[in-house]
Amino acid sequence: MMMNAFFPAMALIVLVGCSTPPPVQKAQRVKGDPLRSLNMEALCKDQAGKRYNTGEQKIDVTAFEQFQGSYEMRGYTFRKEQFVCSFDADGHFLHLSMR
């Protein structure tokens, strides 16, 4: 007799638990600091200028992307050689990738 009441009660608990909607998650968006992004751009241009043996004035940074724990800046030289500068979450330079 007890087993007959156990299964419907468990089914009811499972169905009630599944019927509640999950909480709405909102992405965390950090507002970028303009001074930090300008410093990162200058550092990226400096590193790319050294790597490609050209001056900073011949380097163009075209894109700035923010990820969960890092930043990326894309750009190209006057010879149309593409590169990506990577930075950590604090804005410290990590590496320069040639594309």
Curated annotation (Swiss-Prot):
Keywords: Cell membrane, Lipoprotein, Membrane, Palmitate, Signal. The keyword Membrane applies. InterPro entries: YsaB-like (IPR025728). A lipid is attached at C18 (N-palmitoyl cysteine). A lipid is attached at C18 (S-diacylglycerol cysteine). Residues 1-17 form the signal peptide. It holds the Pfam family YsaB. It is a lipid-anchor. It is found in: Cell membrane. One of its GO terms (cellular component) is plasma membrane. This is Uncharacterized lipoprotein YsaB. It comes from Escherichia coli O6:H1 (strain CFT073 / ATCC 700928 / UPEC). The lineage of its organism: Bacteria, Pseudomonadati, Pseudomonadota, Gammaproteobacteria, Enterobacterales. The gene is ysaB.
